[in-house]
Amino acid sequence: MDELYFYDCNLNIKSFAGMLENPTQCYKFFWLDSIMQLVARGENEFTFLEVFAGMIADAWYAVKEYHLRLGPKSVDGTSSNLLERAVNKISENVDVKNDESRDIIIEKIKCNSKCVNSEMQDLAKNVPYRLLSSFVKELGGNNPLWSKTGKLISYFEMINKKRCLLYTIENGRGLTKKVVINKLWNNFLIDNMVTIRGWIKMKKIKYLQDRNPGVPGLIYKLEPEKDKERKLENVRKLWDCVIDINGVGFKDIYSK
């Protein structure tokens, strides 16, 4: 049955689907979605800084406008989530609106990356590597190799020659390390962009709802709603036409 999980040229879709399983924090969702948005722009190589800036920008509205919890609290009651801390640090040092566009927020983060350097460095220790754990199950979650990023990068390179990993990591200093998307996976990501991003969003919402149980309509609190999507003019026109064609017989059950 395992062969059913291969898309093209030994792309293991089962391993891909396993990337977002059993999260202890929300970072996997934001990391993968940030990568997807870069791929959608035609990029297949990008620095850790670029991906992290996208992650922080994607968390911005939920944290600033609705104060959603992105992860568990620390013992003292403060947030232990690095994305929450990064959003709050940037907002304390830079003038950015709660509903600012994603592209502008990303540029602000890049220009002021020093003030969230510690958060991004902490993210860089595990997130880029652990996302690939479903592709390298032979390592096991407690394998000491996970804490040795240099050797881990070399290991990924070796494994990628035997079976296609989603990406490999090009070594460098700190946040200049690069994510390099496998060309075969790149085609898969582009072909299935809408489906994959919808799947990531579903997983993200489930995780966040568990940490914000009293928040209704959480799906609408992750990003600003575009005005054009809120306009009901076309809907009204449609129902005006339906009423004209059918005449009487429609009853308003809401206002009467």
Task: Describe each region flagged by the PLM.
Residues 1-255:
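Mixed-charge, low-complexity interaction segments
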